[in-house]
């Protein structure tokens, strides 16, 4: 190609440069061969000169090509970093490259090391505090540190009440009634310990489940140590076809009458108030004192009995199925009275041991629920053995 002067370049027309565009050809794929060479007449040099390379900025030394491939927008969620759109945790780096948080221009929000501990601190502690607020402080005080002789009223919620309401103390039921503010009947109990004024109210549902217990007054004594009740296997066997029973061989105990029991049932104490709900409203105050009751029984037999207040003889109740009313137990008895009590149409007979100096008594009556069942209540303990004449027979 011949050299061309600067004057020729200025004289050439822009149209002439492109009039033979069909003769242009591309040589190779490099930038040097991108512009065609003219055949025939010469092509201006500035049209054949290679253009300078494009300015490409260098990437940061902290980034590699694999870092771009690890972008959350290019890869699946299994290789992506945690973000508002993916929500996943980072795995191992792409192509074996491991990246640190300091290598990235953005910083990830730190997550708690133990999610379960965070939840426990948020919810577990709050739930524990709520339960502590629901449990009355007086309940723990009553079980561990008794405040003797103090008047207080404690209401226990339903979720803390056990089915048999056994709290370690001896209780005697003296009444039951239906209150307006509750659909369940309420039973009233008094502590059996002498001179103790503590009482409790037990609310029971129709299915037998205890729904509420209310304590009134504090105990002025520690919890009694109960002895084990005699099992049915320890009852005396029959002699000459007749069933014998010796109350002196049985260790009686105070008991909670909220528990169902056919062996021990303080039936005589229910005379005054246990069935008053069928005839009228119940007064929550205790019935006449024990001393007055025993004096009344002593007047029936024509003799005076002086009993110190607070002394209560043990009671044992035996239920048998028999056609006869009197239970043959080996001792001699003398009948001194009979009457009909409320709640039972069958009469109750009163007997006293004929041995000189023995104050044991018994009451015999048929059950109101079952006419064949005979209830024999023994009060006191014999201070003598079975008479010899009866023992030989």
UniProtKB/Swiss-Prot annotation:
Task: List, alphabetically, the Pfam families matched.
Answer: WRKY
Q: Where is this region: Disordered?
A: 217-242, 277-303
- Compositional bias of type Polar residues: which residue ranges? 229-240
Superkingdom of the organism of origin? Eukaryota
Keyword set includes Nuclease: no
Q: Which residues bind DNA?
A: 160-224, 322-387
Mind listing the UniProt keywords for this protein, alphabetically? Answer: DNA-binding, Metal-binding, Nucleus, Phosphoprotein, Repeat, Stress response, Transcription, Transcription regulation, Zinc
Compositional bias (Basic and acidic residues):
289-298
State the compartments where it is located. Nucleus
Annotated Zn(2+) binding lies at 191, 196, 219, 221, 353, 358, 382, 384
> Which GO cellular component term is one of those annotated?
nucleus
Tell me which tissues or organs this protein is expressed in: Highly expressed in roots and at lower levels in leaves, stems and seeds.
User: What is the reported phenotype of gene knockout?
Assistant: No visible phenotype under normal growth conditions.
GO BP terms: cellular heat acclimation; cellular response to heat; response to cold; response to osmotic stress; response to salt stress
Q: Where is this protein primarily located?
A: nucleus
Describe the task this protein carries out. Answer: Transcription factor. Interacts specifically with the W box (5'-(T)TGAC[CT]-3'), a frequently occurring elicitor-responsive cis-acting element. Functions with WRKY33 as positive regulator of salt stress response and abscisic acid (ABA) signaling. Plays a partial role in heat stress tolerance. Functions with WRKY26 and WRKY33 as positive regulator of plant thermotolerance by partially participating in ethylene-response signal transduction pathway.
Q: What is this protein called?
A: Probable WRKY transcription factor 25
Gene name tied to this protein: WRKY25
């Amino acid at each position: 190609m011949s050299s061309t002067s600067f004057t020729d370049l200025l004289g050439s027309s822009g149209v002439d440069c492109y009039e033979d565009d069909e003769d242009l050809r591309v040589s190779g794929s490099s930038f040097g061969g991108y512009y065609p060479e003219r055949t025939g007449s010469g092509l201006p040099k500035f049209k054949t000169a290679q253009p300078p390379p494009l300015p490409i900025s260098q990437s940061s030394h902290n980034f590699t090509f694999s870092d771009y491939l690890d972008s959350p927008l290019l890869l699946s969620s299994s290789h992506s970093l945690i973000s508002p759109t993916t929500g996943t945790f980072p795995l191992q780096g792409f192509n074996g490259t491991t990246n640190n948080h300091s290598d990235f221009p953005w910083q990830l929000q730190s997550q708690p090391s133990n999610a379960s501990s965070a939840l426990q601190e948020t919810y577990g502690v709050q739930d524990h505090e709520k339960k502590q607020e629901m449990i009355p402080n007086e309940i723990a005080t009553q079980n561990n540190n008794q405040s003797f002789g103090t008047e207080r009223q404690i209401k226990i919620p339903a979720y803390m009440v056990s089915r048999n309401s056994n709290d370690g103390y001896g209780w005697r039921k003296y009444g039951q009634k239906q209150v307006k503010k509750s659909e369940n009947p309420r039973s009233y109990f008094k502590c059996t310990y002498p001179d103790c004024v503590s009482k409790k109210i037990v609310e029971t549902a129709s299915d037998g489940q205890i729904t509420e217990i209310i304590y009134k007054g504090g105990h002025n004594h520690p919890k009694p140590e109960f002895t084990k009740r005699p099992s049915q296997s320890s009852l005396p066997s029959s002699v000459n076809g007749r069933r014998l029973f010796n109350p002196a061989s049985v260790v009686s105990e105070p008991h909670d009458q909220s528990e169902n029991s056919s062996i021990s049932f303080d039936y005589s104490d229910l005379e005054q108030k246990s069935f008053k709900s069928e005839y009228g409203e119940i007064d929550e105050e205790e019935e006449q004192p024990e001393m007055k009751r025993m004096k009344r029984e002593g007047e029936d037999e024509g003799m005076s009995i002086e009993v110190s207040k607070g002394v209560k003889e043990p009671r044992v109740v035996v239920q048998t199925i028999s056609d006869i009313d009197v239970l043959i137990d080996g001792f001699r008895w003398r009948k001194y009275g009979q009457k009909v009590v409320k709640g039972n149409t069958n009469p109750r007979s009163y007997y006293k041991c004929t041995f000189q100096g023995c104050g044991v008594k018994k009451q015999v009556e048929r059950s109101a629920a079952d006419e064949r069942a005979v209830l024999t209540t023994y009060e006191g303990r014999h201070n003598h053995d079975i008479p010899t004449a009866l023992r030989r027979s």
